[in-house]
Amino acid sequence: MMVATDRVSAFDRKLGIEIPDKGKILTAISAEFAKLADNWGRATAYFYADAPCPDEVNDFSLYQFDSYRVIRDAPELAGRFTFMANLRMFPVECIVRGYLFGSLWKLYEQGERKFCGIELPDGLVKGSKLPQPIFTPTTKAPEGEHDENITIGKMVDILNKAGLNGERWTDKVRMAMDIREFCVGLYQKACTYADGLIIADTKFELGLNSDGLILFGDEILTPDSSRFWDAETYVPGEEPKSYDKQIIRDYLAEAKARGEVNPTLPAEIIETTRERYIELYERLFGKIWPRE
């Protein structure tokens, strides 16, 4: 079971702050994209209400257990939890980037042009659309430490050491290539779907199920794991209107520049972030979020 809370993290640290309803919004967005991903031929580990009942659920008789009913009816978990197939997760984070932003832009600005084995051209500006989406995997660093960009070759080494064996995946180079294809493919499908919005980049996490199939796990295309921009106001080189955690990142970066240590988020930043998350959900799926 995966539970999404209202807690906030940024720059690889937990802030001890909550955004009201954030966990529910993330759960709803992930569930909607899980359904879309399955329709697009990108299988996920999600069990959702109107999906055919998976064998894992039938075998487990999940819905007959009192503990399930307790979880389902617990008010503190309402709208925040998702049942998922058990996966052996890959020890890498799978990032797809369609635009030059964030840590990639910082390195590019410093003169770097090769990222995870991929060469980018000169002359790009912050927020430029890349010639094509690029796959930039990273390590999974311990909490408080920064993830490290890695090449596909390094990713293969990590997969070899992870013990993810079986008849299907004796060739870890093929596994890495398939992971890349799955991630870039889902990103491209989502970009086409998200009319009026730009998905600048996103982070996926994947794993193997009991049959050795690669499935998407964890959150999928949420504003916590992705950057969403308003397409109408997007101008390369300018700060885009974002519907994600960038509002929080920008405030914390400004606070750090002012010399503040462990700054807190003011009420207006918290409320703006909540409203942007809600607006994103409504724009993506054409549904109204119940505001209280």
Regions found by a protein language model. Name each.
Residues 241-264:
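A hydrophobic, small-residue-rich beta->alpha segment in the mid-to-C-terminal subdomain
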Residues 167-200:
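A long amphipathic alpha-helix within ATP-dependent nucleotide-binding catalytic cores
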Residues 204-246:
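Catalytic activation segment of kinase domains across protein kinase-like and atypical kinase folds
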Residues 1-141, 257, 261-292:
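Active-site loop/lid in soluble adenylation, ligation, and acyl-transfer enzymes
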Residues 89-91, 196-199, 210-214:
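Coil-to-beta-strand transition motifs
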Residues 28, 174, 178-181, 243, ...:
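Generic recognition of stable, solvent-exposed alpha-helical segments in well-folded globular domains
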Residues 13-25, 141-180, 263-266:
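Short histidine-centered catalytic/ligand-binding loop motif
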Residues 44-51, 192-208:
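A short glycine-rich, hydrophobically flanked beta-strand micro-motif that places a catalytic Asp/Glu
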